[in-house]
Amino acid sequence: MYEIEIMPSLDKILQKLSKRDKKKLKAILKKMEEITQNPHHYKNLRHPLNDFKRVHIDKSFVLVFTVDENNKTVIFVDFDHHDNIYKKKKLFKD
């Protein structure tokens, strides 16, 4: 099993969801736990973001993460509507 690390930008999103949409937050946290069991099961994003993986939540939303094999850590990067994820590619590369 892998450890979980959450980027500060995603942490802000999760905090907002804890106040506005607890059902969606619960779905995200459950999916994070599933991902730590086998993170390589999930698909990579398309180029130029192919270092990142994604999983769909509630049909039109995507949770983006990357895997650090050296530290056995799954780093969760972002959660947003599917249409917006690729527009944020600069965020992922910094």
UniProtKB/Swiss-Prot annotation:
Keyword line: Toxin-antitoxin system
Coiled-coil positions: none
InterPro entries: RelE/ParE_toxin, RelE/ParE_toxin_dom_sf, Toxin_YafQ-like
Pfam families xref list: ParE_toxin
Transmembrane segments: none
Record family assignment: Belongs to the RelE toxin family.
Function in brief: Toxic component of a type II toxin-antitoxin (TA) system. Its cognate antitoxin is RelB4 (Potential).
NCBIfam families, A to Z: RelE_StbE, YafQ family addiction module toxin
Name by which UniProt lists this protein: Putative toxin RelE4
Source organism: Methanocaldococcus jannaschii (strain ATCC 43067 / DSM 2661 / JAL-1 / JCM 10045 / NBRC 100440) (Methanococcus jannaschii)
Name of the gene this protein is made from: relE4
